[in-house]
């Protein structure tokens, strides 16, 4: 029997995106979509947190006070620096309160300094050491960190699943476009319920 596992990667579930006073809360215009996907993700974590064939991993993005990790940033990374978002040890960089009840079940891999969860982290090494062959992506932002991490995982040889109801874009249109047109180029697009069905729990 295969011992390979699925890693549920939680991306961007930090106060600067989700808290009402978060610096980048306004970047997610589709608030209802964001709230729905958060509820779906919490339900999914509840379903898989005790399964031996699943790992739940968080990869928060954090920067030092002078953003020395960023060399002439552009795009969203420039916005992060200019607005002072995701500063290490700041309230905005912390994982949102909704996940606190799962603190013993979620492994946090630190070091992320860019859009890709594999960048500047030991994520790949950890996944291979723990026999992970499939990565399921949940979080924000669909067109940025989700897409970047998904492409990188695919290039590294992992099977990639993007969870359509556990991810959120800046707008509803962006979310739908990526799920319909972009993600299928390198990944499987599933709902959380479909993920559970395609990876049913196997009794010992």
Where do the PLM segments sit?
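Active-site-adjacent betaalpha module
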Residues: 1-7, 17, 46-53, 69, ...
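Active-site loop/turn elements of alpha/beta-hydrolase fold enzymes
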Residues: 13, 61, 165
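Glycine-rich N-terminal loop/short-helix segment of MobA-like nucleotidyltransferase
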Residues: 16-30
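A short acidic, glycine-rich active-site loop
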Residues: 27-39, 80-90
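Von Willebrand factor
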Residues: 40, 44-67
């Amino acid at each position: 029997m295969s011992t390979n596992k699925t890693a549920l990667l939680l991306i961007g579930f930090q106060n600067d995106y989700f808290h009402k006073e978060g610096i980048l809360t306004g970047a997610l215009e589709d608030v209802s979509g964001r709230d729905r996907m958060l509820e779906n993700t919490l339900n999914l974590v509840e379903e898989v947190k005790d399964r031996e064939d699943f790992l739940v991993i968080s990869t928060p993005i954090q920067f030092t006070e002078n953003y020395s990790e960023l060399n002439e940033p552009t795009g969203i990374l420039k916005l992060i620096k200019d607005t002072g978002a995701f500063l290490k040890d700041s309230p905005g960089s912390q994982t949102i309160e909704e996940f606190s009840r799962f603190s013993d079940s979620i492994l946090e891999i630190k070091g992320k300094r860019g859009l890709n969860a594999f960048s500047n982290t030991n994520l790949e090494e950890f996944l291979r050491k723990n026999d992970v062959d499939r990565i399921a992506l949940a979080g924000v932002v669909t067109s940025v960190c989700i897409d970047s991490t998904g492409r990188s995982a695919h290039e590294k040889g992992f099977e990639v699943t993007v969870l359509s109801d556990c991810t959120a874009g800046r707008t509803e249109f962006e979310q739908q476009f990526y799920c319909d047109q972009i993600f299928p180029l390198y990944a499987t697009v599933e709902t959380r319920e479909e993920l559970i069905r395609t990876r049913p729990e196997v009794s010992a």
